[in-house]
Amino acid sequence: MSGKLYIVGVGPGHHDHMTYRAKQVIEESDTIVGYATYVNLVEDLIQGKEIHSYAMTQEVERAHQCIDLAKDGKIVSLVSSGDPGIYGMAGLIFEILAESGWDPKNDLQVELVPGVSALNSCASIIGSPLMTDFAVLSMSDLLVPWEIIVKRVEAAAQGDFVLVIYNPSSKKRIHQLQDTRKLLLKYRKPSTPVAIIKGAFRDSQTVVMTDLEHMENYADKLGMISTVIIGNSSTYNFKDLMINPRGYKSKYNLDEPEIKN
């Protein structure tokens, strides 16, 4: 029997936001591999299956095991929160396979199952913050030097992109978002809207609406399951929502469906 490897995104954490395909392949799989927290997100879907849970920082071991299990004939789901192709395990899996001389057409079958990423789920909670161009950045410097991250932040700030920040801080990493805030204040008003979403669509979900000047007051809301969305020069708040206008107001009368001359 030939095995298969699914790299599965399970979304933000609630089954309502998991794709039909993700549920389908998890059900089809006889073996589940993943970071323990992510495995727990699908605990009720994997009863009776062979389960391999890993701690954080064991990504390489996790990747090799799921590849080996699939090569041995298992149907394996490697589960990730959000989308595995965005700061997820997909990149590492394909790097390892490429290094081994893998032939996608004739060797091990691999299917990437996309999921709802944090940028989608968090944006939906706070309104319409991503209507114009935006940049997605991770503050984690475990694999990318901080100097490179700073260059990317500055480029995004100069380009007036809305920013979506993943991995804003951890117990060992607290200065990165503070440094980012200082850099952004060179280009943006202190009143620029900021949203901090932690645990989107999980029972522990919290949402803080603040601004660039005061965002450092909410360090307790930051962590590895937090996402920070920072507006651009046109972003504004309306009640508990963040709105990033697409530009219709400059062309249309929003009270009447008529195109302006």
Predicted region positions:
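Short, ordered loop/turn segments at secondary-structure junctions
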Residues: 37-38, 82-84, 142, 199-200, ...
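Class I SAM-dependent methyltransferase SAM-binding "motif I" and its flanking Rossmann-like core
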Residues: 20, 88-159
